A protein has these predicted regions:
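N-terminal carbohydrate-binding/catalytic regions of secreted carbohydrate-active enzymes
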Residues: 10-37
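Peptidoglycan-targeting cell-wall enzymes and recognition modules
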Residues: 2-15, 19, 43-153
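Short, mixed-charge amphipathic alpha-helical segments
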Residues: 25-30, 136-142, 164-167
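Non-transmembrane alpha-helical segments in soluble domains
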Residues: 21, 39-42, 151-152, 173, ...
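Acidic helix/loop microenvironments that form the catalytic cleft of cell-wall polysaccharide enzymes
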Residues: 42-45, 164-182
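Alpha-helical scaffolds flanking conserved acidic
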Residues: 1, 31-40, 166-172
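Low-complexity, Gly/Ser/Thr/Pro-rich intrinsically disordered linker/tail segments
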Residues: 175-204
Length: 204
């Protein structure tokens, strides 16, 4: 069981101890290594458990860098820059179970939670697993309990426990991020958490 004191040492809100422990129990995140990896990966995704909703307030140049196929010119990017709702509805349209841009699904099911659950399909399947209708009330995913529970659901269904046990940090990061963005930071936070848990930081 993780304690509020341990979370304080990791600069994580101690009030998250109970929902974290509930998540760890439900999804069998049951060793120091697994728990440290969960904190390291999710901490990178959500500002060390401080930000449970995706920030989509991007400038035109950033849009062109992040989604070059969707924003091939500055003229197109300028039509969306600084408008998070319009950006989400465009970049997340017709994927991840979302309908077209006009439906509003992109913004409705934008990234939320400790692992940035995104898209209608993710909200639906996480809700089915947890017995909560996240499709009807997507904002629930940004509340502390469900921010962590949905992350635990994703972690469990994507084989992250096994990757953490194997200390496959690259593979684990790819499962969560789709690439290796922030790999060094994720590994560093995992090592820090492991040190707090058992006095070790050995990740290999």
């Amino acid at each position: 069981m993780i304690t509020p004191a341990q979370l304080s040492r990791l600069h994580i809100d101690p009030a998250l101890a109970d929902p974290l422990n509930a998540t760890f129990i439900k999804f069998k995140i049951d060793t120091d290594r697994k728990q440290a990896a969960f904190l390291g990966q999710c901490g990178h995704e959500c500002g060390n458990f401080k930000i449970f909703e995706e920030n989509l307030n991007y400038r035109a140049a950033t849009l062109m860098k992040l989604w070059p196929k969707r924003f091939p010119t500055l003229e197109i990017a300028n039509q969306y820059a600084g408008n998070p709702k319009k950006i989400a509805n465009m970049v997340y349209a017709n994927r991840m179970g979302n309908r077209d841009e006009a439906s509003g699904d992109g913004y409705r099911f934008r990234g939320r939670g400790a692992i940035q659950l995104t898209g209608h399909s993710g909200y639906y399947h996480a809700g089915q697993a947890l017995g909560v209708d996240f499709v009807a009330d997507p904002d629930l995913v940004a509340t502390p309990l469900y921010a962590l529970m949905t992350a635990g659901w994703f972690w469990s269904t994507h084989g992250c426990n096994e990757l953490a046990d194997a200390m496959n940090w690259v593979g684990l990061t790819k499962k969560i991020n789709g690439g290796t963005i922030g790999l060094d930071d994720r590994v560093a936070h995992t090592a820090l958490a492991l040190n707090v848990f058992d006095g070790s930081s050995a990740l290999a």
